[in-house]
Swiss-Prot record:
Glycan attachment residues as annotated in the record: N114, N176, N239
Subcellular location: Cell membrane
Designated gene of the protein: Cd5
Pfam families in the cross-refs: SRCR
Phosphotyrosine: modified positions: Y449
Bilayer topology term: Single-pass type I membrane protein
Gene3D superfamilies xrefs: SRCR-like domain
Cytoplasmic side of membrane: 399-491
Protein name (Swiss-Prot/TrEMBL): T-cell surface glycoprotein CD5
Native species: Rattus norvegicus (Rat)
Length: 491
């Protein structure tokens, strides 16, 4: 072997060694089985590697940036190894969020020589989206227009975490096949039908309103996301009266300064809580609402001049129909909150006010206040005592009343009762004059007028004695009566 051949052999060996070293450091996936899981396609899903079992790679590995599209250039070789097209996105996507055993890798991109196990929940899984391979079909007789690969999944919508953490509110993202992004918002065109279709597809009820740019920018991040940002604008609405998602949106180029479509649906959660305070029952009082963990008075609003808001509030308190409502005078020391929607169920945000006109609500109480248990017990005890007294004292009182009535009935007046007649006396109808004389004690019991007073010498019947005295001088009329009726008649 001459010197020229030796030099060529040495150069070949050095080149092979250099290529091997560069390959091991720059493309560590060589020799490691990399696959994408979590979808029906081999070209999109969570990045997993075979290392004593399948491991899911964290999105913070190899110090990747948060820009999904910038990271895509680092995955060209991986997509080719998987038999897919060019890479589209590399980073954390919420499409697939069921990682297995997670590992965090350091060093050059796609190097698995310096990886450590990470506990579940400490890092977000890494996702990769590659272009689907084109299907090889026989050439048709006519030239077909160039089209994108057929989508592997039906088109769908997704909401970026909503306003103040509310469910069913936020920026709308549309995914159709391998293309995903937000929708261009045009303030001049606000089709309600499109909003209803979006909320219905998301199972969030009906469309309420659009979120402004300030409200969208102020959307807080969930705890599990470090830098949440919606995808770039890649779609725009093309038909406001569409019936399917594919008919509603068309592709568009990214425009700087454009606003993404953000909606609020009727089924947002949590809802505003309400109550009535300061009244005689839970169905009467001043309307208050709960914002976060504090209660505040609900101020009167021009958006709710009718009874609709207050009827809904009565229903929330499980009361009857609305009876009345009136606005109270504003007080400097009475702050509150304002709802700009017509009904409380539509209020996704509340505005603070320093001078609040409170509203006093009166609803029909389905359970009116009855007698207190103590009052009922007192009434029952009183009735029991009354019955006992009637049983014990009733017969005795009855006997006394009957006796008194009979004694009064036994007394009668005998004699003239004319104006010019002066003779009158009282006697018992059961006793005669003779019996009175013969048995004075018994007569005194029946008639207290039958005996003269013990301490007096006067007669008990002066008129009768006078008549008898005068009749003694007259001829005897052979009358069997105790006294002369003719003389008594003259008197």
């Amino acid at each position: 072997m001459d010197s020229h051949e030796v030099l060529l052999a040495a150069t070949y060996l050095l080149g092979t060694l250099a290529a091997f070293c560069l390959g091991q450091s720059g493309r560590g996936f060589v020799g490691a089985q990399v696959m994408l899981s979590g979808s029906n396609s081999k070209c999109q899903g969570l990045v997993e590697v075979q290392m004593n079992g399948m491991k899911t790679v964290c999105s913070s590995s190899w110090r990747l940036s948060q820009d999904l599209w910038k990271n895509a250039n680092e995955a060209s070789t991986v997509c080719q190894q998987l038999g897919c097209g060019n890479p589209l996105a590399l980073g954390h996507l919420t499409l697939w969020n069921r990682p297995k055993n997670q590992i965090l890798c350091q060093g050059p991109p796609w190097s698995f020589s310096n990886c450590s196990t990470s506990s579940l929940g400490q890092c977000l899984p890494l996702s990769l989206v590659c272009l689907e391979p084109q299907k090889t079909t026989p050439l048709p007789t006519t030239t077909l227009p160039t089209t994108m690969p057929e989508p592997t999944a039906p088109p769908r919508l997704q909401l970026v975490p909503g306003h103040e953490g509310l469910r069913c509110t936020g920026v709308v993202e549309f995914y159709n096949g391998s293309r995903g992004g937000t929708i261009l918002y045009k303030a001049k065109a606000r089709p309600v039908d499109l909003g209803n279709l979006i909320c219905k597809s998301l199972q969030c009820g009906s469309f309420l309103t659009h979120l402004s740019r300030i409200e969208t920018a102020g959307t807080p991040a969930p705890a599990e996301l470090r830098d949440p940002r919606p995808l770039p604008i890649r779609w725009e609405a093309q038909n406001g009266s569409c019936t399917s998602l594919q008919q509603c949106f068309q592709k568009t180029t990214v425009q700087e300064g454009s606003q993404a479509l953000a909606v609020v649906c009727s089924d947002f959660q949590p809802k505003v809580q309400s109550r009535l305070v300061g009244g005689s029952s839970v169905c009467e009082g001043i309307a208050e609402v709960r914002q976060r963990s504090q209660w505040a008075a609900l101020c009167d609003s021009s958006a709710a001049r009718g009874p609709g808001r207050w009827e809904e509030l009565c229903q929330e308190q499980q009361c009857g129909n609305l009876i009345s409502f009136h606005v109270m005078d504003a007080d400097r020391t009475s702050p509150g909150v304002l709802c700009t929607q017509e009904k409380l169920s539509q209020c996704y945000q509340l505005q603070k006010k320093t001078h609040c006109k409170r509203v006093f609500i009166t609803c029909k109480d389905p359970n009116p206040v009855g007698l207190a248990p103590g009052t009922v017990a007192s009434i029952i005890l009183t009735l029991v005592l009354l019955v006992v007294l009637m049983v014990m004292c009733g017969p005795l009182i009855y006997k006394k009343l009957v006796k008194k009535f009979r004694q009064k009935k036994q007394r009668q007046w005998i004699g003239p009762t004319g104006v010019n007649q002066s003779m009158s006396f009282h006697r018992s109808h059961t006793a005669t004059v003779r019996s009175q004389v013969e048995n004075p004690a018994a007569s005194h019991v029946d008639n207290e007028y039958s005996q003269p007073p013990r301490n007096s010498r006067l007669s008990a019947y002066p008129a009768l004695e006078g008549a008898l005295h005068r009749s003694s001088t007259q001829p005897d009329n052979s009358s069997d009566s105790d006294y002369d009726l003719q003389v008594a008649q003259r008197l």
